[in-house]
Amino acid sequence: MNSILFLLGIAAASGLDAGAGYDENRDGGPTETPASDVSGDGAAGALSTADAKADAPAMGLLSGRVLTKGSRGAVPGAKLTATGTTGQRTTAESDDDGQFEMTLPCGAHALDVRAPGFEPLSLNRDACSNAAPLLIRLRARPNMPVYETIVVAPSDEPNLVLQRQELTTTPGSLGDPLRTIESLPGVATVAWPAPVYAIRGSNPGNTGYFLDDVQVPMLFHLALGPSVIHPYFFDSMAFYPGGYPAKYGRYVAGIVTAKTRAPAEDGLHASADVRLYDAGILVSAPWPDGKGSKEGKGGVTTAFRYSYTGALLSQIQHSVHLAYWDYQVRADRQVGEWRLSLLIMGSSDDLAYDLEAGSDKREYAIRFHRAGLRAGRALGKGRFSAQLTASADHSTAPIVQGYPITVDAYSVIPRAGYQHVTEHVDWEAGLDGQAQWFMPMAGVPMASTSDLALKRTALLAGAYGSAAIRAGSRLTLTPGLRFDSYTIGDTTRSDLGPRLAARLLLDDKTWLSLSGGRFSQAPSLAVQIPGAENFGLRLYGLQTSWQGAFGIGTRSIRSLEIEATGYLQRYVLTDMRDPTLKNHDPWSADFLVRRDARSYGLELMIRRPQTERVHGWISYTLARSERALGGGVLGPSDWDQRHILNAVLGYRVGSYTLGGRMHVNTGRPVLVRNDWDERFQRLPTFYQLDLRVERRMVFDAFTVDVYLEIVNATGTRTVLGLDQDPVTGQTTENSYRIVLPSLGIRAEL
């Protein structure tokens, strides 16, 4: 740690710190003179006569940059006011790179620097005695983070957006942005700490995840691993529990879309983090020839993470082998009128363990790689963008015990769209598709009636259009239409999905929202497994859903934002026919079944933004998820949790942030059978308390964050299911207790 601080200190020493104290606003004084209106050539005033030159004061050029203290990020729009001994004021404003210039008479000047969200800074400076560029560092206000969380439905699409800072500091998430999903309304965690989520009563495999519009086949590393994307590679995340935009498709539940951080264009930035479980690094820098010019402007961001806990665990428990790593690269470049962006990412997991002494090992190996090139430019009065992504997946996993399958899958994914903005209507239209080749090698007889274990080709194509129509100052309507075509093997199916979103402002702080539509998806397993997708179209047909949601929200109560949403969704899904898994053959035609389903509920979100000293949210979900079991019988789905409550709280005290999360959910149903009866029995209610404390130390050119987090500090046991004695029929709980501590340190410059 000392060596990291020493190296960062050397980097910081290369710049000149303004280093002056802080001052309050000063009122009064003579008329301000903009810097551009002050005459001068750096030595004397440019007057037209010799006498005027003799009487004019000598002039000097004061220039420099305004940066964020602790991160070296540029502060655009900072207002600088220089007041001379005569009371004359000269003003300037920093540009997008934080740079500024002002011409001043020689002599002492009081320089006042202010920017929204930062503490004011005052210092004294003589433009003539020291011509070196001035480096000014502003400290962000403790109660005003630079990155604010927004949980507001925009005018055209209802959703929930989390920005960078909240993604990595939510208690219970272990600093992992994607784990914040489990604290949001409408989300049921199947069995903590496994990151498997059922959204609004659907199967976990019915929700899609996208990074910069590139579909990610899995969210998390195996076992208790983090997400497959470096946490500081994210910029924002949007959550659509239902009614998602028409530009996305092929999932019948909701989607999660994440955006990556744009590469730095103002200089080298780097961060390194070390945790109990792994270590990672992220480096971002501009192109060497692009700084300060439009042509070639852009940069590169790279991230890599490696887990060393697998090696430690393997040494402690010889029957377990665990290892994972991941990488991400984003490169942006301006080429003429085109903005190019290249995204490359990949992940690898290996897990092997013995179920019991003397038994065969269960082995998992999951790897995926994605490379996508996106190009965009202004075209007419709108913007055109095109993207081409190539992917390679490899999976070795026993879908059920005794039936391992190894699959290699390759894909080419094109996408193109056009957005047009006018005074009253914003519309967009586009095309997308996917060509996918599966080459499985299964350890089962190939006389299977399912094509999941067979070589196959999938060709998917979609077209969409939507328009945000502003009907006056209060009402926005967003109709949309999407067409999807699915060809798997020799079978083709298609679906037309109308969609509608609406938002009505009752006043400046209260609104009504509505969303709904039809969605489709190829058959899928209940839980996503890379390579085990796009199969069985001939046997099961398309999965479909009709969704509808209505909400009301307000910001009229102090600094709170409150929103309540009711929803109803009807599905046709591919489900496991027998939840007790008496039939263990995943290749048989009746392992999966086409089944009608229904879910409905109420979601409540009460939030105080992170700009407040006390911040956080409370989310509550009252839900019911049902499946048609045949013969007119409705039963609860495997993921049905009636009540889900999350309370997330953070409190800033100086450089410390204290946080906690309380989670409670009622149990899922489990089917219990004997010779004369079968019934659903609920698992026990699960609750947990998560605690987090973090300290941020801000130096001139870098920051250091040290944090301690304890997840499930209550030590509550997770009941995974029920084991039933085949003779007596008595049940016992299959449970475990896990407490996850995390101690970490992160340095960023």
Feature annotation, model-predicted:
Residues V38-G40, L47, D95-D97, G117-E119, ...:
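Periplasmic N-terminal accessory/gating domains of Gram-negative outer-membrane beta-barrel systems
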Residues T83-Q99, T103:
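Short, acidic Ser/Thr/Gly-rich low-complexity loop/linker segments typical of extracellular
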Residues Q215, D350, M439-V444, L504, ...:
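Surface-exposed extracellular loop regions of Gram-negative outer-membrane beta-barrel proteins
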Residues Y251, E265-D266, L282, P286-I366, ...:
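Periplasmic-side early beta-strands and strand-to-turn transitions of outer-membrane beta-barrels
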Residues T309, V320-H321, R339-F384, L388-S411, ...:
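Flexible loop and strand-edge segments within Gram-negative outer membrane beta-barrel domains
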Residues S411-G417, L454-Y464, L539-G541, Q547, ...:
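Outer membrane beta-barrel strand-and-loop segments of large Gram-negative receptors
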Residues A471, Y567-R570, D590-P669:
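Gram-negative outer-membrane beta-barrel transporters
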Residues V664-L671, R695-L749:
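C-terminal beta-signal and adjacent terminal beta-strands/loops
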